[in-house]
């Protein structure tokens, strides 16, 4: 007996897929605004690509859902202990069914992306491979797993910007970089926060490998790089003064997160501060055009 529609949506973690899709739309909007305001004479984005935006949303939604489904496929043993209510360990979905479902979503999402333009398609294909490799291997690899999450999260914005080809990627590269750095730093902080539980489960994370102190220094360094690079869009004349003012709030949040991590030894509060800072950084990009 095949799984229900509700079970398929559950294994996709459709709420996360919606967030990833909307992040791509935000990337399209920001890239469009930047290119419209600062477009070189040889390039103009024209009218806002509404139809392509719908396609990019669907492509990101499907690829993200595929990544979540295949993650459950490889995590079936762990989930049978920690999350027995998940679709596979609960018996509501067969193991092979989850695998075939994820491959179908990967294929549909990638085909949709290629229908927009080759750059969108290449990003979809590459991200699909990263998601498969992450679920199978990278998730249990110290630092590389954190970097993978940072890249994949930040690439949602690049995905949306790729509607405009290479010019779109150039316009959104700094936002991608800031998001990737901030997410990577926060992922390391979360691993520090979860050290006791991860140790009991036999997980191999960066803090368990090198110690909480060294991992904290690395997370702080990566977060500080996000602060250093944050004024770049203003200095490159991509975004205006509003961006600079608003991103300063984000920078204060990043610095507060670093302070909580290093001076107060409070990874839980640091993780929350990183999340708040990323929200202000996103607002700065939206409002800064």
Curated annotation (Swiss-Prot):
Subcellular compartments: Cell membrane
Keywords: Cell membrane, Lipid biosynthesis, Lipid metabolism, Magnesium, Membrane, Phospholipid biosynthesis, Phospholipid metabolism, Transferase, Transmembrane, Transmembrane helix
Cofactor(s) the protein needs: Mg(2+)
Membrane topology note: Multi-pass membrane protein
One Gene Ontology cellular component annotation held by this UniProt entry: plasma membrane
Enzyme Commission code: 2.5.1.42
Keyword Aminoacyl-tRNA synthetase tagged: no
A GO molecular-function annotation: geranylgeranylglycerol-phosphate geranylgeranyltransferase activity
Pathway(s) where this gene product acts: Membrane lipid metabolism; glycerophospholipid metabolism
Transmembrane parts of this sequence: 17-37, 50-70, 106-126, 141-161, 163-183, 221-241, 243-263, 269-289
Primary localisation category: membrane
Keyword Lipid metabolism assigned: yes
Gene3D superfamilies: UbiA prenyltransferase
A Pfam family the protein falls into: UbiA
Function recorded in the entry: Prenyltransferase that catalyzes the transfer of the geranylgeranyl moiety of geranylgeranyl diphosphate (GGPP) to the C2 hydroxyl of (S)-3-O-geranylgeranylglyceryl phosphate (GGGP). This reaction is the second ether-bond-formation step in the biosynthesis of archaeal membrane lipids.
Family in the record: Belongs to the UbiA prenyltransferase family. DGGGP synthase subfamily.
NCBIfam families: PRK12882.1 (NF009521)
Annotated protein name in UniProt: Digeranylgeranylglyceryl phosphate synthase
Organism, as annotated: Methanosarcina barkeri (strain Fusaro / DSM 804)
């Amino acid at each position: 007996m095949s799984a229900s529609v509700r079970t398929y949506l559950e294994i996709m973690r459709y709420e996360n897929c919606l967030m990833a899709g909307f992040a791509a739309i935000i990337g399209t909007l920001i890239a469009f605004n930047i290119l419209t305001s600062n477009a070189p004479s040889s390039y103009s984005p024209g009218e806002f690509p509404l139809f392509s935006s719908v396609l990019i949303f669907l492509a990101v939604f499907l690829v993200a859902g595929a990544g979540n489904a295949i993650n459950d496929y490889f995590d079936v043993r762990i989930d049978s202990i920690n999350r027995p209510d998940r679709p596979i360990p609960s018996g509501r979905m067969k193991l092979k069914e989850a695998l075939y479902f994820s491959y179908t979503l990967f294929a549909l999402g990638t085909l949709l992306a290629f229908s927009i333009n080759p750059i969108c398609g290449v990003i979809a294909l590459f991200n699909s491979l990263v998601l498969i490799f992450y679920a199978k291997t990278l998730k249990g690899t110290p630092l590389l797993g954190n970097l993978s999450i940072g890249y994949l999260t930040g690439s949602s914005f690049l995905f949306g910007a790729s509607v405009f080809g290479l010019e779109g990627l150039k316009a959104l590269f700094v936002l991608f970089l800031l998001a990737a750095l901030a997410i990577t730093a926060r992922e390391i902080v979360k691993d520090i926060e979860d050290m006791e539980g991860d140790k009991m489960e036999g997980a191999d994370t960066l803090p368990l490998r090198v110690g909480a102190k060294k991992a904290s220094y690395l997370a702080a360094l990566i977060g500080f790089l996000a602060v250093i690079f944050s004024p770049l869009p203003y200095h490159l004349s991509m975004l205006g003064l509003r961006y600079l003012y608003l991103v300063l709030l984000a920078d204060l949040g990043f610095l507060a997160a670093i302070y909580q991590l290093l001076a107060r030894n409070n990874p839980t509060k640091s993780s929350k501060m990183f999340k708040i800072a990323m929200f202000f950084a996103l607002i700065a990009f939206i409002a800064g055009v």
